[in-house]
């Protein structure tokens, strides 16, 4: 819902006529969340067989999602079913619309990462795959420390230390460190593959490899990385790159709970919108 809230809060300045969100299941314990989004100016839709239940919860403005599909110019799918929804729903809609899916839906469309390849939005395509948070993080590190400075990157290695689940979730918590298998012999996990494909769209071929492990924490993903360059590089130069970056932030904090707490207290909807937060003393 932070994305819905952001778009609704700024719809006038963004030139949006309406912000419509789809809620599948009417749950009384989520009434407050829906009320908050409606107060911001967003409109709720659902399937025909659940609209009456939303009306019973007090959301008399709830309407049919099928009409929303017809009326909307841009459809953003934030579910792990984006590819299935394309096959079953979106492919039959007006193809002048723009369709976006989350990072898990590999193959949905061209990779897009904000601040990394904005120019892809100008291409004649109607399907975009929004890169995941880890893909944004890795791509921004590669772009900031290598590509933007025209340094020849020999190799990039990454270990994604992933949170078990989000603080908003009760399910899928991992009680112990759990390793993610290397499903790709060239890239390891999908994280390096996704970043490689993102830059390959621009004709750049990068030697990247990633591993991942899920840890019993709900705070934030953490990334370990090692970049090897052809030529020697000075620590001062790297720090200058970090401090001048628009999308990477620097911090003196050394624990994810401290960074998470700062974002909760000062971030938009309690979120940090930077691609990554780099602990200065770790470089």
Region annotations inferred by a language model:
Residues 2-5, 82-86, 137-140:
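Short glycine/serine/threonine-rich phosphate/pyrophosphate-binding segments
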Residues 2-63, 152-155, 159-160, 165-283:
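C-terminal substrate-binding/catalytic lobe of Rossmann-fold NAD(P)-dependent oxidoreductases
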Residues 67-69:
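Structural alpha-helical scaffold elements that stabilize or flank donor/cofactor-binding regions
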Residues 72:
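An anion/phosphate-binding loop that grips the pyrophosphate of nucleotide cofactors and donors
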Residues 81-126:
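Rossmann-fold NAD(P)-binding glycine/threonine-rich loop
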Residues 110-182, 186:
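Rossmann-like dinucleotide-binding core of oxidoreductases
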């Amino acid at each position: 819902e932070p994305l819905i809230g952001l778009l609704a809060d700024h719809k006038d300045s963004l030139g949006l006529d309406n912000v419509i969100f789809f809620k599948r299941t009417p749950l009384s314990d989520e009434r407050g969340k829906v009320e908050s989004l409606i107060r911001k100016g967003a409109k709720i839709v659902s399937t025909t067989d659940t609209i009456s239940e939303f009306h019973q919860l007090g959301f008399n403005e709830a309407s049919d999602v099928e009409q929303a599909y017809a009326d909307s110019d841009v459809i953003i799918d934030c579910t792990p079913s984006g590819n299935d929804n394309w096959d079953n729903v979106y492919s039959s809609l007006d193809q002048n619309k723009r369709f976006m899916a989350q990072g898990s839906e590999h193959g949905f469309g061209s990779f897009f990462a904000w601040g990394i390849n904005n120019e892809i939005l100008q291409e004649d395509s109607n399907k975009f795959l929004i890169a995941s948070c880890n893909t944004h993080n890795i791509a921004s590190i590669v772009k900031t420390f290598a590509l933007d400075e025209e340094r020849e990157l020999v190799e990039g290695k990454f270990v994604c230390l992933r949170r078990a689940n989000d603080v908003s979730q009760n399910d899928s918590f991992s009680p112990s460190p759990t390793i993610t298998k290397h499903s790709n012999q060239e890239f390891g996990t999908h994280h390096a593959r996704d970043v490689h494909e993102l830059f390959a769209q621009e004709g750049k071929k990068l030697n990247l490899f990633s591993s991942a492990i899920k840890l019993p924490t709900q705070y934030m993903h953490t990334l370990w990385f090692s970049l090897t360059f052809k030529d020697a590089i000075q620590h001062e130069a790297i720090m200058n790159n970090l401090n001048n970056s628009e999308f990477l932030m620097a911090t003196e904090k050394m624990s994810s709970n401290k960074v998470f707490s700062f974002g909760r207290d000062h971030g938009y909807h309690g979120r940090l919108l930077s691609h990554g937060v780099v602990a200065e003393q770790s470089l």
